[in-house]
Structures are given as C-alpha cells and as structure tokens.
A protein has these predicted regions:
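Juxta-kinase regulatory segment immediately upstream of eukaryotic protein kinase catalytic domains
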Residues: 1-21, 67, 71
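ATP-binding glycine-rich phosphate-binding loop
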Residues: 13-38
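ATP-dependent phospho-/nucleotidyl transfer catalytic cores
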Residues: 21, 25, 47-58, 113-128, ...
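Conserved hydrophobic/aromatic beta-strand scaffold that supports enzyme active sites
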Residues: 31-33, 109, 211
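Short, well-ordered amphipathic alpha-helices
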Residues: 34, 64-73, 196-197
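Short beta-strand element of the conserved SAM-dependent methyltransferase core
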Residues: 34-36, 110, 188
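ATP-binding pocket architecture of kinase catalytic cores
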Residues: 41-65, 72-148
Length: 214
C-alpha cells in the first residue's frame, strides 16, 4: 500500500499533514485531499497521474504550468479579486519539478480550492456558466498565436483520425453487434464530412488550433 504521507513529503508544502483521503469520483487519475493540521496553512490535492493515458508527464505538467501562468497573468492585468480561487496553484516537488516519481508512479500536487465541488448532472444554468468559463479560458489564451503546448495524447481531438478508427472497428465487427446498430452507424457516417470540417479548415489556414484542455 502506498504511503501517501511519504509521497506528500516530497513536495514543498506548508504545514503539517493531518489526514489524506480520496477526493471526488474521477475516472482517470487517483485523487486525494490532503488536509493540514492548522487553519492558517492550505490544504492540497494530491494526484497519482495515470501513465497509461498520460505517457509524457513532464510535458503534461509543463502544459499546465504555462496555461495557469497565462490565466493568472490576465487575471492580474484586470485586477481580479480572489485569483487563487480562479486558477490552479501548482506546488513543486522539493527538487523543483512539477511532479514526483516514486519509482512506480508519477504524482503531482496543487493547492486545494476550498469549497470547490464537481457536479454529476448538468442543469441549464450549469451549462451556461460552463460556457462562460470556457469562453473566458479561450480569451485568456488567444493572445499567443502559437503557444508552446505539446500534445499529451496525440490525435485525441482529431476527428479524421477518430473516424478512421471507427471505420476499422466497423470492418472488424469484433463483437458481432453491427447489425443491431447499423442505423446509428449510417447516421454518424453520413455526418462525417461536417464532423471533419474543423480539421480541413485548419489545414487551409482558416481556423487556428485552440487549447481545450491539458
């Protein structure tokens, strides 16, 4: 069993760790809330990064560092209040890297935003607020034409690539279920030209690449 307190000791935290317990219901990384003993020191979010998905952890963390620094810069420029609640604060390891490798797993740490929560169901108001937040996110990053961001999962949002995978799966019909869903497959393939429009426009120089997440 992993000694989470020992893992946390490799980061430049303030205060004494009182408790570490699982946090949230995420499906990719293992996430823990690190509670410190006294109210004048922050709590933290500790994550074990899923290396099966994120194979280049240094790149992943550098992406996050760049993006959060740009968001923080723009918030400071507009004299926003409570900035530490509006963007992540990364906590470096004691060797100043933005992750710690224990010989088996990669770990990262951020300051916990008190009172933050996730929602399992989306209401119209939540969808609206999410749209506003995403629009602001795009605005904050739009002033850098070619941001130094690397692809942590190559072709993850490349619809042409994904449709190619889909067509291969159709040809294999590995689970012999194609006949049951053929109308849905036909409808999806009928929309393929529209679905790939963004990639075509980018190749033609008409649509810039945008950062969606790290």
């Amino acid at each position: 069993m992993t000694d989470l307190k020992a893992i946390t000791s490799h980061f430049a935290i303030s205060g004494e760790v009182a408790e570490i317990k699982p946090l949230g219901s995420g499906l990719i990384n293992d996430t823990f809330l690190v509670t410190t003993r006294y109210p004048d020191t922050p709590d933290y979010v500790l994550q074990r990064i899923n290396q099966a998905i994120f194979t280049d952890v240094p790149l992943l963390q550098e992406n996050i560092r760049y993006i959060t620094s740009r968001i923080r810069y723009h918030l400071q420029q507009r004299n926003a209040n409570d900035i530490d609640r509006k963007t992540l604060t990364l906590v470096p390891a004691t060797d100043e890297r933005l992750y710690y490798y224990d010989g088996n797993s990669y770990w990262r740490l951020t300051i916990y935003i008190a009172g933050s929560k996730t929602f399992e169901q989306v209401t119209p108001d939540l969808a609206y607020q999410t749209g506003r937040a995403f629009g602001e996110f795009q605005y904050f990053l739009s002033d850098i034409p070619n941001p130094p961001i690397g692809a942590t999962i190559p072709d993850f949002h490349n619809m042409e690539f994904r449709l190619g995978q889909f067509r291969e799966a159709i040809a294999r019909d590995k689970a012999a279920r194609l006949a049951k869903v053929q109308p849905i497959v036909d409808e999806l393939l009928g929309r393929s030209e529209e679905m790939c429009r963004a990639e075509r426009l980018h190749r033609e120089g008409k649509l810039p690449k945008r950062i969606t997440h790290c």
